Amino acid sequence: MSITASALSLTVADPEQSARFLEEEFGFEREMSADGFVSLTRPDVAFNLIFLRAGLETFKPRDRAGRTAAGILVVLVVDNVDAEYERLHAAGTEILTPIETEEWGERFFQVEDPNGVIVQLVQWVAAPPASVVA
């Protein structure tokens, strides 16, 4: 199999709100949009992030069209998580979790978009210990 592109599609109540949040806070760019659909991209991200309106008439399978994303983390690995924390805090973005460093070397914090999608910014500050590497 040869994968030529990839995308993550999330079903939310208001795709425009989620798209604006990622455009304004994280520099994503709108690649295309239509009623109930927004596709975002960034040159340094390997996938498109797509927001679909819950109940969208063209959603397949149809019996799942009304469900919204829950328990989803969109993880963005950055060079300097502390600088991103300060930037977002200064901009008035609500921070869900303060910066934490896990024993496996992941330093992160979380924010939430208007539809409840959690965006986690991560910086790897140390190699994970052998006990957690597969």
Per-region residue spans from a language model:
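Vicinal oxygen chelate
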Residues: M1-A7, E29-V77, Y85-E112, Q123-A134
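Conserved active-site tyrosine of GNAT-family acetyltransferases
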Residues: S18-E23, L88, G116
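Short glycine-/small-residue motifs
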Residues: I118-L121
